[in-house]
Design a protein with these regions (language model features):
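Cytosolic/stromal cytosol-facing helical appendages immediately following the last transmembrane segment
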Residues: 1-17, 136-220, 241, 246, ...
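C-terminal ends of transmembrane helices
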Residues: 42-52, 125-130
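Short membrane-interface loop/juxtamembrane segments of multi-pass integral membrane proteins
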Residues: 52-53, 96-100, 200-207
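Intramembrane catalytic core of multi-pass membrane enzymes that act on lipidic substrates
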Residues: 59-188
């Protein structure tokens, strides 16, 4: 069954829930174990050239839909465990032993944040990205909105569909990392640009429809409310510290999302209004990364045909390729940025020599 591998994200969320249930150092074990599994798996597994054209779309969509309740349940477990174990909140149906099991130290809480944020940012936002490219009115669009809210980025679908896919590779795209730009500078610039552009897009949409800006018709305001709902719920159940843990998990997921943006287009350029081609994205055939991200790794084909569902994306082996899998690239960009730039330099040189148009080379030389 071609889709069998895409049950792995669901198993990972379930495994993380078991680790949270066990408490103690188990969340750290999950985070480190998953990081090693994906980074080494990307190196050892065969390149991902699988053709999924014949899969059942209803099954594939069901896999995406299922990520939503699983991650909501995982966040709920975080709220309950911190509320009971640290805030000493008494909840019905839970025995006294849970308070001791979930009495996390600050370092153990960090393990919870890293584990849950990794799944939200790696699995959740990837499923959300797939959902928000569905036709308007499709039920998965709502799933995508709520999944993006978990990464403190509910406005992402507005800007991504109307901005990034139109402006990728140009100076008008906040989500394209510039040559030599550090990932931390990029995260700030991209986030600010995304929120500002999403507000502009939504304001113009409401003006065209003669609807009020400060109303329930405003998708931007609804997106902010969805993101705020999770830490507010955590505060109501378990107090301020519980809300902080949930908020930090969501912010870590946001960092991961922006770092994915960073690695997908780092240093690439495109002349404004020129056709978007496979060369304008860094592609990857890493099997583990592709499995966990629902083939977000086939980014070159995605940007050429944004409406295609993940099972119809081709691997495009002739597109520019990342030298690592996604998670390896993320960790290197975050922890060893100078090394990231050094390794990417020959790949960028090759891109300008073999992929870039004359106009793109001239554009890069002037920037």
């Amino acid at each position: 069954m071609a889709l069998a591998r895409f049950f792995i994200p669901h198993l990972l969320i379930s495994l993380c829930a078991i680790c949270l249930h066990n408490g103690g150092w188990w969340p750290w074990t999950f985070f480190l174990g998953l990081s090693v599994l994906v980074t080494i798996g990307d190196r050892l597994c065969p390149r991902d050239h699988a053709d999924l054209q014949g899969v059942n779309p209803r099954t594939a969509n069901a896999l995406l839909f299922a990520i939503w309740p699983l991650l909501i349940a995982l966040v709920a477990l975080v709220i309950v465990s911190v509320a009971v174990g640290i805030q000493q909140v008494t909840l019905p149906l839970l025995g006294a032993g849970y308070a001791e099991r979930w009495d996390y130290t600050p370092l153990q809480v960090l393990g919870v944040v890293l584990s849950v944020g990794l799944l939200i940012g790696g699995v959740g936002t990837s499923a959300a990205h797939e959902c928000m490219h569905r036709p308007r009115g499709h039920r998965l669009r709502t799933v995508g909105d709520w999944l993006m809210a978990l990464s403190m980025d509910g406005v992402f679908p507005i800007e991504h569909n109307h901005g990034h896919h139109k402006n990728v590779g140009t100076v008008h795209d906040a989500a394209t990392a510039r040559y030599g730009e550090s990932v931390y500078r990029f995260i700030g610039r991209s986030t600010w640009g995304e929120y500002a552009n999403a507000w502009r897009v939504e304001r113009e949409r409401l003006e065209r429809q003669s609807r009020g800006l400060w109303s329930l018709h405003n998708r931007y305001l609804r997106a902010l409310a969805r993101s705020a709902a999770f830490p507010i719920l955590a505060a109501l159940v378990g107090g301020g510290f519980c809300a902080l843990v949930v908020l930090l998990s969501m912010l870590w997921a946001k960092v991961l999302l922006e770092t994915v943006n960073y690695i997908e287009h780092y240093g690439l350029v495109r002349v404004p209004n020129a056709p978007i081609e496979p060369r304008h994205s860094w592609n990857s055939t890493a099997w583990m990364s592709g499995t966990i991200t629902f083939l977000l790794t086939r980014h070159s084909h995605h940007h050429q045909h944004g409406a295609l569902p993940f099972w119809r994306l081709n691997d495009m082996p002739d597109a520019p390729m990342l030298p690592w899998g996604y998670l390896s690239a993320i960790y290197i960009a975050l922890l060893r940025h100078a090394h990231y730039r050094a390794v990417m330099q020959p790949h960028l040189d090759h891109w300008f020599d073999h992929y870039a148009s004359r106009e793109e080379c001239q554009l890069a030389a002037r920037s």
